[in-house]
Amino acid sequence: MTLQFLSRVLPKLPKSDPLHQQVNQALDKCLAKLQNSQQQDGSWGGGSWAGVLQSSVGCSALEWAAAAGKTVDGTVLARARDHQKGNFNAETGRSSAPDSAGIELYAFAGSQRAAASEAGAARQLIEEAKENGILPADASCTVENLMTLGVDKPQANTLYKSYAQNMAQLEQLDNEQLLSGFGNNGGEEFLSYMLTSESLVLQGGNAWPKWKQKMNTRMAKIQIANGSWTGHHCITSPVFCTAAVIQCLTADRDEVLLRAINNQDASVKPERL
């Protein structure tokens, strides 16, 4: 999370600012620690109740760092994404993970977030091609159409699979049984909602406004009188929970940096990041 914070701060600091060098060095240090601590399966650690969320935050932190201009090991990023995306079953439309504590929401949000940038990149490429007359106005996102635009076949397959996954997951956003998570709200639920918010901004389309309204209504009902939110299981810290809720409700304010993540997936192969 520190890496994500610093990645947001660095682009806003002019190089003449006294803090720029300190933030830049701290970001480099965090990025090195994160990349060096990844396990071979693409996850991080296992020292938490729902490790799938821990690994999801690690995966998205790599994306934030790349968007901030840092050189990210493409193998590490691809491994992190694949680990999370593998928790979604395309045949059943369900999500599960050994380290999700048996809660589908956590695996769902992590897999959705891991695929979101590639899904958004696929959408971006197809929409721009239609606007420029390269593809017909009714063209859909397919491997063949992506290859027509110059994307090599392996990358076209990756982008399309992520796009198809995210489109399938959109159908689950009204599933209250899924969204209820553990059954009452802990920091894990708020973090999952935040991951979905980022996913919807990344992948583009019309789903974000509807989701934002749903979350505004949901969070207003459980906000404490002092303006904070607190968890009722596991992660109970009002500081953590309130921060996650605020980011859940304001993900679109990070749209410029999130779009930078899209642009990288739309223009280069992961190993060249």
Positions of PLM-derived features:
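Preference for long, amphipathic alpha-helical scaffolds in soluble/luminal domains
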Residues: M1-L273
